[in-house]
Amino acid sequence: MAPKKNKAAKKSKADINEMTIMVEDSPSNKINGLNTLLEGGNGFSCISTEVTDPVYAPNLLEGLGHMRQDSFLCDLTVATKSKSFDVHKVVMASCSEYIQNMLRKDPSLKKIELSDLSPVGLATVITYAYSGKLTLSLYTIGSTISAALLLQIHTLVKMCSDFLMRETSVENCMYVVNIADTYNLKETKEAAQKFMRENFIEFSEMEQFLKLTYEQINEFLTDDSLQLPSELTAFQIAVKWLDFDEKRLKYAPDLLSNIRFGTITPQDLVSHVQNVPRMMQDAECHRLLVDAMNYHLLPFQQNILQSRRTKVRGGLRVLLTVGGRPALTEKSLSKDILYRDEDNVWNKLTEMPAKSFNQCVAVLDGFLYVAGGEDQNDARNQAKHAVSNFSRYDPRFNTWIHLANMIQKRTHFSLNTFNGLLFAVGGRNSDGCQASVECYVPSSNQWQMKAPMEVPRCCHASSVIDGKILVSGGYINNAYSRAVCSYDPSTDSWQDKNSLSSPRGWHCSVTVGDRAYVLGGSQLGGRGERVDVLPVECYNPHSGQWSYVAPLLTGVSTAGAATLNNKIYLLGGWNEIEKKYKKCIQVYNPDLNEWTEDDELPEATVGISCCVVTIPTRKTRESRASSVSSAPVSI
């Protein structure tokens, strides 16, 4: 009898389920096993990283474009008067605020009528919506801008604006201005007009120039930033436009009133302006010529005759240095006047009529005035060589005229302008320290003595604040002083003010806004030696109090100071610690209460004077330098 087979033990459902679960969990267990490598001490760290498919977005747009061409799943029609386009709502609404707003109001909308748009403009917009690309042309850009503005696709408007600015040329600049004006593209219009101002001579030779309206050419000739080699060129361009059409002659007086005849040399007025028939036959035009000739014939009256027609066009406000004693040629004084251009490069502007040291300078009505100082280098007896010289430089024509000398010789004094007058205060000469004050009246070319200070003072500094001349520190009774006094030109009287915290002499003083600043200079130390004064003091005329601001980075005396763009510039000077001339330029920002080092002077210099004047553009100066009739002259 065959042996019985052992029956396999019957497995319960729980056992079966457990087996099933074990089989199903195997891959998961493998993953968990791998994860333990990350968590274990011998594992490695892992961070998640976002990855991007660079061709996904372009492929998506390309696919949507093919779907639109096949009219597949298109759910909206946009139509002009003559042509319709099938599009996808989601695509158009994603880039057009106009369409998005309409669909928000009515998501079931099937058609949008855009009867004011051209088919070309709408087709270009649709191409842009589906590709982000488009072909622009000056011939069709108007229709594209019109469509982009209506549909409120701001990125497309920006692309069109950038295209117009990039494509602007002498040939098409007027067209670009008109396009920008039509569609109120302010940035584009300003850029095109700026291009025209900078290339006005080249534009004036184009046919489009002669098609300018009176309003357009008048706007250009009124513009202070119009770049031309000379104002004579502006006159010739205006005459060219007037002569093109006899109907324009009625505009001659008004148009030519924009020409700054006072900045045209007398020689050119006679040779090139007077011989234009209109300037002699038309009474109003003739008056413009006569006024300009009188302006040149009366140099001492020019201050009160200043007007828009005597101001250089497109002038540059620059920092000037005047005279001084350079370190490399310590025994000889300098005649040079330097200016710093837009690139912070120092250039020679002109020369003074004579070498000078410790002179004072001031700017009034656009003219540079240079007064006093010393004409010889004699450190042991500077006062002996004080001079009373006084001259005026005209940066428009690069000319000097010698004016009436000061009544007294002065060095180590101060010079300020107020209400159209110049005031020379204190100083010293061979007679010793001076308390006297004299005032120059430009219209009469005369100096007048004014009320003197209570005590003689030299080596001080002064600035105009709150309608008064504030005189600070200096040398009084053979000692450095803290004393401050104020001169009121309206009453010709002096008044003592609160003293400085630190005595100082050979320092500088300037005004920025409603505050006066006293900076630099030297005083006596504990052992009787001269030391630099680093603290800078600020005067508040409303409270009459002095306060400290950020100190100088480098101590200097007999330096030059000026203000430009609401910043104080302190240039050169003598440093007591190093016992050497300095070429550093220190700049103070009152808003930040901070001093910084700027580019240096070309040469270390002491006894230098500084100011800010407006000079003609380089193009204008070069044009005059090449013209015999405009060569520098001295009266």
UniProtKB/Swiss-Prot annotation:
GO terms for cellular component: cytoplasm; nucleus. PANTHER family: KELCH-LIKE PROTEIN 31, LD33804P. This is Kelch-like protein 31. SUPFAM superfamilies: Kelch motif, POZ domain. Pfam families: BACK, BTB, Kelch_1, Kelch_KLHDC2_KLHL20_DRC7. Keywords: Kelch repeat, Repeat. The gene is klhl31. InterPro entries: BACK, BTB/POZ_dom, BTB_POZ_KLHL31, Kelch-typ_b-propeller, Kelch_1, SKP1/BTB/POZ_sf. It comes from Danio rerio. Signal peptide: none annotated. Kelch repeats lie at residues 318-366, 367-420, 421-467, 469-514, 516-566, 567-615. Residues 74-138 form the BTB domain. Residues 173-274 form the BACK domain. Strongly expressed in fast skeletal muscle, and weakly in heart. Not expressed in other tissues. PROSITE patterns: BTB.
